[in-house]
């Protein structure tokens, strides 16, 4: 249901009726896993989305690069340091970042830890997004604090506009206490579908539609290094109904991207 809701929201973005805001770490790690870090990422994205909504007068679809973004695509299977060559670091869910032979040995147990961390992160995000932490007035106060301390009024005009809107709604009796939409947000998760065995293990059949969904995230994408038309990543992604993206780099050719889109989404 959540993936379908995101797909509908992204359709609004494609039609120019909404904005997409996606943000988060390049790669999550075990060492930096902490509720405060998750809270801060969530908080910043909420602050940014409020400013975008106020400036453009359009809804903002909020997607975090979080709760599963562990794997790192590498250009080479090995790396050298001080004359020593070791297997490349592939992400905390595969091997360790430390430049030692022991750390660079792939360990399947890391997948269980990554799964557990992702589940905990998602549960905390759901609590933040639905439990009152995302109260519109609170997000506005965060922005006001940022403006007063950091930017010397650079964005004061926008925040004054938000203050006036909140005051008007409150005068009309529309408050977070009696309107759930003012104290909750829809927040979605995303990551690159790089490690196919893990993504396959997380794929389930929707009993109501018979469609396949990758339950490791709401939104997944194919990376610049793995978007070969005859490759496994395109083959996997064409079989799931999640909303998805294709990363396009400097080497991307328009005709190639069109072919990939036709394979992944032949219905459109």
Residue positions per predicted region:
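N-terminal basic/disordered segments at the start of proteins
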Residues: 1-19
